[in-house]
Amino acid sequence: MQVPKFFFFNLSMLIIGLTTVCKCKDCSKPPKTITVSQSGNANFKTVQSAIDSVPSGNSQWVHIQISPGVYREKVLIERDKPCIYLKGGGGGSTSIEWNDHGNAHFTATFNIKASNIVAKGIAFKNTYNTVDTGKVLQAVAARVHEDKIAFYDCEFIGVQDTLFDSYGRHYYKGCYIQGGVDFIFGSAQSMFEGSTLFFSMGLGPKVDGVFTASEREEDDNSGYVFKNCNITGTGGKAILGRSLNAYGRVIVANSVLSDVVRPEGWESLHHNVSKITFVEEGNAGPGANTWHRVPWTKHLSGSGLHQFLDMSYIDKEGWIANIPSL
């Protein structure tokens, strides 16, 4: 890897350990609406300026309606601006794009540091590796680093390290995530439901890739759950995931796996694999044959599997039900 991901992850976990666990209050309704349009026929012309207008310490839902267009800007939601709902016209018509690479903590096109954030119908793209750069480097489309964050019908497009699903509880519903190497990575506690993971290196020769890269502490509840998803791609083969330390956790269930999935399925960067939890249950498709998988994958059934597939895995207190219907 071009960037030593384990270093940044360990730094992240240290920072998290030194901060208070998020006790995020629910946001109040009804939402206030502000608009964004590049034509100027709106409250703001850029997404960032609309976010900047939200008062510090905000506790009421703010609906930011984004008109169709390609917004070439880097967008940051700071920690003191929770309760924001960004809504576009769909990934095919509303996109936020930037061209940057390097440290994943600071170079993402879309960077979330606040809790209670929702995005719907928006594409987030890092275009660095999709042009003739001559190299494939860490280039993050979105970094998600707080609690109670949801994405509906969104797209995340990149090549290496597309989605930095860093920390907190997250829900991805009906989303499309595209990349080539570790394109969903981090230490978050997240559920991906009815979503598509598409492997594509985007440039260069056909090479093998990695869908996920997971790292967690032994006592954390974190991990990635993929439920009713479509895992596919083109231009090579990819493993479902790799563990960056001794405790990675990824569950793939009731999903369709194409033949893009390599027979061994998984790998670990740590020599001790006994506490890694890589699980495949109830899947279909040519890539779902587990006969040649690495021997240390886990099998879960009944309540052991249900604890991860149930929404309570990421939502015990009902924060998703508090999201406005927009």
Where are these regions (language model features)?
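Sequence-level preference for short, compositionally simple segments enriched
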Residues: 2-7, 17-326
